[in-house]
């Protein structure tokens, strides 16, 4: 009845392949801002996360950071890390840059980013955070919730690492930090459509959103719900409100540009 998945690229592809059906729900319209749901009612965000910078405050001056392009500055050569461009979160980040700035400027971004890598991309987002804390690199591009998970993991090493690094929200003077989501849609031939809609309505209610925010350290999509304590401690930030379908449209182009720019 329901497809639930992470990443706007996956939700957009499901819509393009005609796997989802449109839903009209006043409850969902009230619970979810318009840029976080499909204009045809085929998918709806349930949680969201920011693609942000985690940095070592001993070696990085945050006054020198700005948008994602700031990581291509010569002063950051040999200091930046992130995971592979084949990862869905980096594909969607690059797709959002293409949507805002076009292909030519996005290729410049990729080439500049790769030129500043401290190492070839490897590992997941937690591995990038650990590498920053260990001194292998100075700044990483990661999803926000990974730091929250590490800070509350019960693993003393990871909890200490989470205290050592700092968070920076990119593009606060321009587009806002890139947002990705986990979302849900009703499958095209769902036998229990009405109950499926009720489930998504519940998942975006204040009650469920509070539980999700506290449980996985993602940002709630329902504006009435506050994030978990550690997430809130990073401060409020400006998020990119581009309709996420515009990001999904550029996912394939993002793969091409990452390949052309040698982002492994």
Model-found features: residue ranges?
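Short loop->beta-strand "edge-of-pocket" segments that line small-molecule binding or catalytic clefts
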Residues: 70-88, 96-98
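A bilobed periplasmic-binding-protein/Venus flytrap-type ligand-binding module shared by bacterial periplasmic
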Residues: 52-59, 179-192, 211-212
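A structural signal for short loop-to-beta-strand junctions that line the ligand-binding cleft
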Residues: 1-6, 21-53, 69, 80-81
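Periplasmic-binding protein-like
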Residues: 78-86, 202-226
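Ligand-binding clamshell of periplasmic/extracellular solute-binding protein-like
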Residues: 1-21, 140-147
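Ligand-binding pocket segment of bilobal, Venus flytrap-like solute-binding proteins
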Residues: 85, 92, 96-170
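Short beta-strand->loop
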Residues: 21-29, 43-44, 69, 139, ...
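Extracellular/periplasmic bilobal clamshell ligand-binding domains
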Residues: 227-264
């Amino acid at each position: 009845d329901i497809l639930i998945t992470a990443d706007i690229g996956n939700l957009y592809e499901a819509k393009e392949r005609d796997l989802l059906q449109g839903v009209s729900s006043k409850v969902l319209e009230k619970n979810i801002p318009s840029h976080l749901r499909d204009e045809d009612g085929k998918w709806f965000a349930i949680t969201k996360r920011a693609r942000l910078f985690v940095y070592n405050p001993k070696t990085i001056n945050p006054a020198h950071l700005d948008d994602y392009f700031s990581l291509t500055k010569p002063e950051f050569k040999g200091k930046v890390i992130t995971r592979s461009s084949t990862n869905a979160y980096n594909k969607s980040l690059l797709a959002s840059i293409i949507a805002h700035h076009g292909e030519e400027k996005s290729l410049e971004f990729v080439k500049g980013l790769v030129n500043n890598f401290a190492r070839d991309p490897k590992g997941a987002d937690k591995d990038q955070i650990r590498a920053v804390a260990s001194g292998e690199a100075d700044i990483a591009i990661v999803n926000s919730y990974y730091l929250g998970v590490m800070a509350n993991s019960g693993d003393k090493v990871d909890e200490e690492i989470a205290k050592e690094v700092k968070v920076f929200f990119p593009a606060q003077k321009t587009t806002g930090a890139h947002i990705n989501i986990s979302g849900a849609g009703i499958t095209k031939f769902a036998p229990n459509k009405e109950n499926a809609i009720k489930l998504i309505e519940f998942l975006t209610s204040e009650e469920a959103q509070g539980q999700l925010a506290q449980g996985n350290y993602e940002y709630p999509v329902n504006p009435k719900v506050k994030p978990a304590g550690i997430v809130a401690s990073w401060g409020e930030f400006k998020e990119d409100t581009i309709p996420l379908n515009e990001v999904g449209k550029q996912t394939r182009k993002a793969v091409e540009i990452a390949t052309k720019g040698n982002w492994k």
